């Protein structure tokens, strides 16, 4: 890890362990990227001593743990944090998480939030370096808080939005991903995002056509995965950019 700080150290499953002691991570000073996933907290809400994370010099943290309720440890991570992934999936009513906790991380450039990590979501527009935002299961009725940001990537996943026209104001976007937005049929706003390089549409059965993309000089790839769009009906300049799987 000293030689390859880009490598992610992963902790997962521990199916037969009622309690998991991760204090050994303090003996790995060169670890910068950590992923903790496939661990269920339903039977024991204190299954892992997550307070240990405050003693690590993490630049990237990926948390995908079912029924994890208390995320207060997020407030005490390293000031070096650049990437944060929080699945926030539970069977219960809610979690302890607040987006205002993230404002101390001035170097945060990539943020992925799951459906219950949405309290004070609009405050993330105060993160000066945030470039990539992914929201899963979070339905927004007002996107205007995003207009103040210079986002380069936006991903909206698993929500019930039917009108995304406000996204036309995000002129700095280079990549947009829309995935399993069941009520969505109109994506005409994409024609206004002329800096786009990547468009990814997945599991959008009601989306049957692409808008005019002839004013998108930087467009490189268009991923169309399980949509209602007939690729053969697209203009030739688009057909050559289309792929039905994301191989990046």
Identify the meaning behind each predicted range.
Residues 1-20, 24, 30-103, 107-141, ...:
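Concave beta-strand-loop units of leucine-rich repeat
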Residues 190:
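Serine-hydrolase catalytic core
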């Amino acid at each position: 890890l000293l030689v390859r700080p880009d490598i992610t150290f992963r902790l997962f499953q521990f199916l037969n362990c009622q309690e998991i002691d991760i204090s050994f991570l303090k003996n790995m000073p060169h670890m910068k990227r950590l992923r903790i996933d496939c661990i269920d907290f339903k039977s024991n809400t204190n299954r892992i001593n997550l307070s240990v994370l405050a003693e690590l010099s993490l630049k990237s943290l990926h948390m995908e743990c079912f029924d994890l309720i208390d995320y207060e440890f997020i407030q005490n991570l390293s000031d070096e944090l650049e990437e944060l992934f929080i699945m926030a999936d539970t069977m219960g009513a809610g979690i302890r998480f607040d987006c205002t906790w993230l404002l101390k991380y001035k170097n945060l450039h990539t943020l992925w939030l799951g459906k219950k990590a949405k309290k004070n979501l609009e405050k993330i527009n105060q993160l000066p370096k945030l470039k990539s935002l992914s929201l899963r299961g979070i339905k927004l009725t007002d996107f205007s808080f995003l207009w103040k940001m210079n986002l380069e990537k936006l991903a909206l996943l698993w929500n019930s939005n039917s009108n995304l026209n406000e996204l036309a104001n995000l002129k700095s976007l280079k990549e947009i991903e829309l995935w399993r937005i069941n009520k969505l049929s109109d994506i005409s706003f994409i024609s206004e995002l002329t800096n786009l390089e990547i468009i990814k549409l997945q599991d959008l059965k009601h989306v049957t056509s692409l808008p005019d993309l002839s004013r998108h000089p930087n467009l490189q790839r268009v991923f169309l995965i399980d949509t209602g769009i007939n690729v053969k009906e697209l203009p030739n300049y688009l057909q050559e950019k289309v792929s039905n799987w994301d191989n990046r």
